[in-house]
Amino acid sequence: MAVGKNKRISKGKKGGKKKAADPFAKKDWYDIKAPSVFSVRNVGKTLVTRTQGTKIASEGLEHRVFEISLADLQGDEDHSFRKIRLRAEDIQGKNVLTNFWGMDFTTDKLRSLVRKWQSLIEAHVDVKTTDSYTLRMFCIGFTKKRANQQKRTCYAQSSQIRQIRRKMREIMVNQAQSCDLKDLVQKFIPESIGREIEKATSSIYPLQNVFIRKVKILKAPKFDLGKLMEVHGDYNEDDIGTKLDRPAEEAVAEPTEVIGA
């Protein structure tokens, strides 16, 4: 009787099954440091592939943009509708030093502001700060009923909308051109520009919910480490590392004279 091949018995593959490589084994965690204008400085961590040969880890992190809620940066839930963009500018040790790179509204907040029986007024303008950052600022505002108004609607006329838009641009330019980026961000957080626009346009038509809803950075100046360290004002040496004393073995011993040589 011929002995046939048992097809059910499968041969084992040579070398066995390959072990899946852990994708995190070749990566490092870095701390993201926010500028000093925000209350919370250590805002999170980011991953980057470890330095291998000519591929340097810090180059992979350079100019990486992080989007963080202003509520997390300020520790206040009232600011949760605003998103802040921070760009990695420099890497020191395991810390990524960032700078402001724009902001925006959350979609749900923007949709909640738009209602019936009122006029929506928008304006945008390109401005240059004193430290040579070129920004595009977008402003939004809504008309509201005058005091003791019985009429259901509060629509502004086209001529009034043009006047309000002109006033919005004028205030945005004046506020941005008179300060640097750090001071301008400090104006964005408490909505001081929106309140100024509200006050200035009250004689034309009363407004409500006036916000700088979006800021885009169109052009940034050449990188300057000194300026970045000013933005991270209270960034101390403890974050970078501690200074170590030189070991005694490394100290050069003084030659001793041998008597009788």
UniProtKB/Swiss-Prot annotation:
One of its GO terms (cellular component) is cytosolic small ribosomal subunit. It is found in: Cytoplasm. Residues 1-18 have a biased composition (Basic residues). It holds the Pfam family Ribosomal_S3Ae. The keyword Secreted does not apply. This is Small ribosomal subunit protein eS1. InterPro entries: Ribosomal_eS1 (IPR001593), Ribosomal_eS1_CS (IPR018281), Ribosomal_eS1_euk (IPR027500). The gene is RPS3A. One of its GO terms (molecular function) is structural constituent of ribosome. Keywords: Cytoplasm, Ribonucleoprotein, Ribosomal protein. Signal peptide: none annotated. It comes from the Eukaryota. It comes from Catharanthus roseus (Madagascar periwinkle). PANTHER family: 40S RIBOSOMAL PROTEIN S3A (PTHR11830). GO terms for biological process: translation. Belongs to the eukaryotic ribosomal protein eS1 family. Component of the small ribosomal subunit. Mature ribosomes consist of a small (40S) and a large (60S) subunit. The 40S subunit contains about 33 different proteins and 1 molecule of RNA (18S). The 60S subunit contains about 49 different proteins and 3 molecules of RNA (25S, 5.8S and 5S). Residues 1-20 are annotated as: Disordered.
